């Protein structure tokens, strides 16, 4: 009986413990370019190489960053980027430049193409 009482007490108390349920759903955000493309009045005859955008380490994470007061940054807990912002913004920029026909050819840097111009960009906050 002395052994049975602690076991029953543990069994009863374990029924009071609430197991965590599924957490909030994670939301994925995709950066898009909804604006219309303005055509260039003239196309430059060169090849433009677009280097992947530089970004501080804070903005290379999978979670979006927010700030509630100056000098502080935090990550959203239940939100994610579909891909790193710098990579996605570089792709959107390249698509926009190709569609606007500013240069005869727009190519990513490192694609094995010899270019006449190189565009370097940086993400700043």
Feature locations, PLM:
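Residue-level marker of positions within ordered structural domains that often coincide
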Residues: 6, 55, 98
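Sec-dependent signal peptide recognition
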Residues: 2-10
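A structural "domain/chain start" motif
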Residues: 17-86
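Surface-exposed short loop/turn segments
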Residues: 17-39, 75, 95, 99-125
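C-terminal motif of bacterial Sec signal peptides marking the signal peptidase cleavage site
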Residues: 12-15
